[in-house]
Amino acid sequence: MSTDSQAPKALRGVGNFIDDRFHLAKTGEKNLRKVFPNHWSFMLGEIALYSFIILLITGVFLTLWFKPSMQEIVYDGPYERLNGVLMSEAYASTLHIDFGVRGGFLVRQIHHWAALIFVASLVVHMLRVFFTGAFRKPREINWLIGVGIFTLAMLEGLFGYSLPDDLPSGMGVRILQGVMLALPLVGTYVSMFLFGGEFPGEDIISRLYMLHILLLPGILLALIVAHFMILWHQKHTQYPGTGRTNKKVVGTPMFPGFAVKAGGFFFFVFAVTVGLSAFVQINPIHLFGPFTPTSITSGLQPDWYMGFMEGSLRIFPNWLDFQIFGYAVPIGVLVPGLVVPGLIFGGLGAWPFIERWITGDHRAHNVADRPRNAPVRTGVGVAGIVFYGLLWLAGSNDILSHTFSISLYWTTYFFRVAVIVGPIIGFVVAKRICLGLQRRDRETLEHGYESGTIQQLPSGEFIEVHKESSAETVHVLESKEEVDRIDAETISSVEAATDANGVEAPAARGLKGRLRAKLAHWYTKDNVSFEGVEAHTGHHLHHGAAEEKEPAQAH
């Protein structure tokens, strides 16, 4: 029997034809052997990618029947409860998708759920990158691309949410227009340009539709491709462990291991999305009715990722508004609607460079930090989460007041204080927890772990025997990088910032240098040092008992 496993002659001919022109054989072989680390948190980015693919597929389906027009018609369709109601063609076509197209309601639900999962997975993925320091050199550009993807994803979701022209989406567009009007000097012109006249105008749906299906998806697709190309070139970060270094990645090769896992995970994400869409209804526009400028309702909430902006608008005081030369400057809308999101996204994008400037760390990092080993960074991240979460809850202050029978004014006052105090408390608590975990790690590295075995010494004292940690655990604990702490005395002393001739160090000159020194001290002053700590080994297991036996024998 022949054991020849060569491909058929026709396929070999095609393969040789392509390889002779593009030389893909060696490149393909190398890429197929590329190693990906094995850890569940690295699949969070995969969820975002797969959700985006689902969005593209379902979005193409929906565009076949959706009509982006604000032309008013009298509805006469399959949803009988709204027959005879005046509505836009956009809303009527959405009702047709839900009730007139077979499977249309399910596809629209899948599209909406995929959008929510897409943004959620982006958030969790970015949190993983932030807390592990995976944004550091050489990945600053990829971090900026990720922030751009996150920002555009929120805008894309907002515009898509506004297309059906039902009551909640119309209210969202009205809030958007109010934020645009808050722009000093140019706000009115920007609003008129986008809406084609006074609100609601006749062009906003068609213009948002163009942005939603063409411009923003194209930019998102380009950024996602760039993100993965950079990731492929720079290699993946990995958590500390045996054999894992800045130059060596330990994991599963691209083919067949990772490819099979990724393919199966895509179908899992798709199945979960379809399951949610089939059994958990979301955004039932047929129950809300068409939007009219004179209509409003209570209890409605935007998609979760826009809740922080609504909360910011609700709790920000309006007594800060003022006028300049007769022009109103509505601080109560301008700051929560534009400044707060700008600070959030701007802070995210700038953080890698801020941290590098403070610490002076210009090294390349391919091994991720444990969050506990960067207590200030972790504290800042927790403070940001608390700030975002409180704003998100503030967007439901009316529902909270109604549910718990609390005055709306009191919930508003509470959130005004909480968004300032809460992040500070979150930072302090998270930092102290990280420092406590560092001390426990140092003790585990030096003395081993508690075995649960109690031993009595000759003196009558009882101790718990510690056992040697595994090699993997020791490697993880020893992966903590030593951070040089800057003493407060060093900063406050003029002599410490000068050389032997009394010349001030260039880095310490001026306000900028002194500010950096203060921040560096704050960033590193409490870090627990592992310097000089040796891993616990077997011959140290009973050192406490041995020390007690020697004086007993002397007697």
Question: Which ranges hold each PLM region?
Answer:
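Membrane-embedded alpha-helical bundles that constitute the cytochrome b-like, heme-associated redox core
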Residues: M1-I315, V335-H555
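Short linear, low-complexity motifs centered on an aromatic residue
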Residues: N318-G337
